[in-house]
Swiss-Prot record:
Substrates-to-products reaction catalysed: oxaloacetate + ATP = phosphoenolpyruvate + ADP + CO2
Organism, scientific name: Rhodopseudomonas palustris (strain TIE-1)
Function: Involved in the gluconeogenesis. Catalyzes the conversion of oxaloacetate (OAA) to phosphoenolpyruvate (PEP) through direct phosphoryl transfer between the nucleoside triphosphate and OAA.
Protein name, per record: Phosphoenolpyruvate carboxykinase (ATP)
Binding site for Mn(2+): K201, H220, D257
Cellular compartments annotated: Cytoplasm
PANTHER family documented for this protein: PHOSPHOENOLPYRUVATE CARBOXYKINASE (ATP), PHOSPHOENOLPYRUVATE CARBOXYKINASE ATP
GO function terms (MF aspect): ATP binding; metal ion binding; phosphoenolpyruvate carboxykinase (ATP) activity
């Protein structure tokens, strides 16, 4: 077997059970991985120097194909209401079949950290069949120094083989595509898909399992910090604006998607960003555009000009879920430490497909826990297979597919941290205004940015608020530079009766969804629920 690159020779492929490999490329950097991806026909080069790959059939995550081993370790610690199980025996069969499938292959291996805080990070080794997948995960996780690689012993190991085809009868899964996690052995198996985001989210899922026991709240959020050291957290599902809104030229970016919140503050799990880039433009998102049109960026399913090879970010013919992965260093004002102090503001982003939520509202701590557990948004086109237009969705903790433990574990931790650090909480609608999806229009990003700036710099504390008659939270009545009518959603609708009907419908959906949590929360949180009786008064 031919091995090239820096690694710990005493802890190689044999420790994972890999044998009869043709070769291993260890910890290659971007230039080498570009060369292999291009030589192997895995990807092409854009005119700007980005590496552009197609992910084939799977252009998004496939949550129904994700499984966790149910054993003595997980029986009473996993949230089985939200996770699918396989037996330890089925996983072992799958694992051995993965090892057999890898024989004769040349694999790419990366030794990386999941987490910027040395106390809580997890040492992660990722074996990939494809060179561009190796570049992707190297970009998204945190890269050790060269000297650290020579003694690196992984705690978590992923193997990613897109050419593997699972057998549902033999392996206990649903289809030929599979993501299987064994928390006791700290192994993740990914097969049958070329969608690179499965790797990143598998590491996130493992951190979501291990960190609460260490007193750290893992979060599906972005984070940034202002010039005065004021940290802000942005919760939200894919496509709601986490990446876009946290990339603020006046604030330092900590990270765009995954963080932990513990005794010393907030830390990024990652070393890169993974931005949706459909309709990406230099005018609306200059930093993300610049990071996506340069050497080192990995573009997924982006259409290139036939002759000039220029990315056409407006073309969603392959998928609406076009993506750009780039290192944090590509953002001019990104924090390279990936760490910041205790948050002063928590923002919950919702893409309201009904168009009845205000562009911003202030939440009490109880309302914050209610909306965190509710996790309301719209599923935005393309993030998952089969979703082509926004549909209302409740995804608890703004990340249901990635929660191994019961949502109340994360909800209670958030409430305690908000109270302990006296954090201001906001709900921001980045969805629709002027009508329901299809008749209204998307909230202007400039309005959202202006309102967020006012919230984060403290100026929103000094304005007059009204109580929303449907949702009960506090809504500003006026703010300089923002049209006052957009602050009150009913004023943006031509048909006021239709607004009332739609708002009541959404309130009912909130109540129906939250019923499953009522036994796990106290009276104060239950009282924070939206209530149609308010609207009738």
């Amino acid at each position: 077997m031919q091995e090239t690159g820096v690694h710990n020779g005493a802890y190689g492929t044999d420790k994972f059970g890999l044998k009869n490999l043709k070769g291993v490329y260890w910890n290659f950097g971007a230039p080498q991985l570009y060369e292999h991806a291009l030589k192997n026909g895995e990807a092409v080069l854009s005119s700007d120097g980005a590496l552009v790959a197609d992910t084939g059939v799977f252009t998004g995550r496939s949550p129904k194909d994700k499984f966790t081993v149910r054993d003595a370790t997980t029986e009473n610690t996993m949230w089985w209401g939200g996770n699918q199980s396989i037996t330890a025996e089925q996983f072992e069969t799958l694992y051995q079949d993965f090892l057999k499938h890898a024989e004769g292959m040349t694999l790419f291996a990366q030794d990386l950290y999941g987490g910027a805080d040395p106390t809580f990070r997890i040492k992660t080794r990722v074996y990939t069949e494809l060179a561009w997948h190796s570049l992707f995960i190297r970009t998204l996780l945190r890269r050790p120094e060269r000297a650290e690689l020579e003694n690196f012993v992984p705690e978590l190991t992923l193997i990613d083989l897109p050419s593997f085809r699972a057998d549902p009868k033999r392996h206990g899964c649903r289809s030929e595509n599979v993501v299987a996690i064994d928390f006791a052995r700290k192994i993740v198996l990914i097969g049958g898909t070329q969608y690179a985001g499965e790797m990143k989210k598998s590491v996130f899922t493992t951190l979501n399992y291990y960190l609460p026991e260490k007193g750290v709240l893992p979060m599906h959020c972005s984070a940034n910090v202002g010039p005065n050291g004021d940290t802000a957290i942005f919760f939200g599902l894919s496509g709601t604006g986490k990446t876009t809104l946290s990339a603020d030229p006046n604030r330092t970016l900590i990270g765009d998607d995954e963080h932990g919140w513990g005794k010393d503050g907030v830390f990024n799990f990652e070393g890169g960003c993974y931005a949706k880039c459909i309709k990406l433009s230099a005018e609306n998102e200059p930093e993300i555009y610049a990071a996506s049109t340069r050497f080192g960026a990995v573009l997924e399913n982006v259409v290139l000009g036939e002759i000039d090879r220029k990315p056409d970010f407006d073309d969603g013919s392959k998928t609406e879920n076009t993506r750009s992965a780039y290192p944090l260093e590509s953002i001019p004002n990104a924090s390279l430490t990936g760490r910041a102090g205790q948050p002063k503001n928590v923002v919950m982003l919702a893409a309201d497909a009904f168009g009845v939520m205000p562009p911003i509202a202030k939440l009490t701590p109880a309302q914050a826990m209610y909306h965190f557990l509710s996790g309301y948004t719209a599923k935005v086109a393309g993030t998952e297979r089969g979703v082509t237009e926004p549909t209302p969705e409740f995804s608890t903790c703004f990340g249901s597919p990635f929660l191994p433990r019961d949502p109340s574990v994360y909800g209670n931790m958030l409430r305690e941290l908000i109270a302990k650090h006296n954090v201001d909480c906001w709900l921001v609608n980045t969805g629709w205004t002027g009508g329901i999806y299809g008749t209204g229009h998307r909230m202007p990003i400039k309005v959202t940015r202006a309102l967020l700036t006012a919230a984060l710099d403290g100026s929103l504390r000094n304005v007059e608020f009204r109580t929303d008659p449907y949702f009960g939270f506090a809504v500003p009545t006026a703010l300089p530079g923002v049209p006052s009518e957009i602050l009150d959603p009913v004023k943006t609708w031509a048909d006021k009766a239709a607004f009332d009907t739609t708002a009541r419908k959404l309130v009912g959906m909130f109540q129906k969804n939250f019923a499953k949590f009522e036994a796990q929360v106290d009276a104060e949180v239950r009282a924070a629920a939206p209530d149609v009786k308010m609207a009738a008064e």
